[in-house]
Amino acid sequence: MTEKKIIIIIYSILAAYCSYFILGNSFFLFTDNSWINSIDMVQDLVSWNFFNDDIWRFPIGMNPNYGLDIGNSIVFTGSIAVFAILFKLINFTLPENFHYFNLWFFICFFLQSFVAYKILYHLTKNSLYSFLGSLFFLISPIMIGRLIMHMTLAAHWLILLGFFIEISSPKKNKLKYWIILISLSSLIHF
């Protein structure tokens, strides 16, 4: 097994542990919403439910039944638009009351620590230092605080990806990577 695969497995395990530490058994249950207790997260769940239960509309992401009189779009809520659209595509296979918010926790923990590792390794070329340094990013109190209050704003890994683009990408590719990163961040929270 290559070092890259081992690192991905280690960060996956750490991300799963951190997600489980916060969510408990709900981490494994994509239909359990008992842990969703902040006003913002309830609003995100309600927006996802309205969007998921509605027909497909153009432009993609329209959510006219959510909101008072004027409707809304999934990109303007904290429902992680890219996930809402992807999971709506397969909603006929999903159980009732399905949500992807616990998956988002895992992704944030994984990418936060993995991208931090990549940055630190690029700067130090030392796997041990990079791993130990990335643990501080994994348990970042600011990110964890955002996760449990307003999930989409916990995508601090997007900022880290921006740093990584700047320090590691050839000049000719930077614009392309920035366009991809900004597009992705817009699909997470507008």
Walk through the language-model features, giving the residues of each:
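Short hydrophobic "helix-edge" motifs at membrane interfaces and signal-peptide entry regions
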Residues: T2, W35, G67-L68, Y129-F131, ...
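Membrane-interfacial loop-to-helix junctions in multi-pass transporters
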Residues: F58, S127-L128
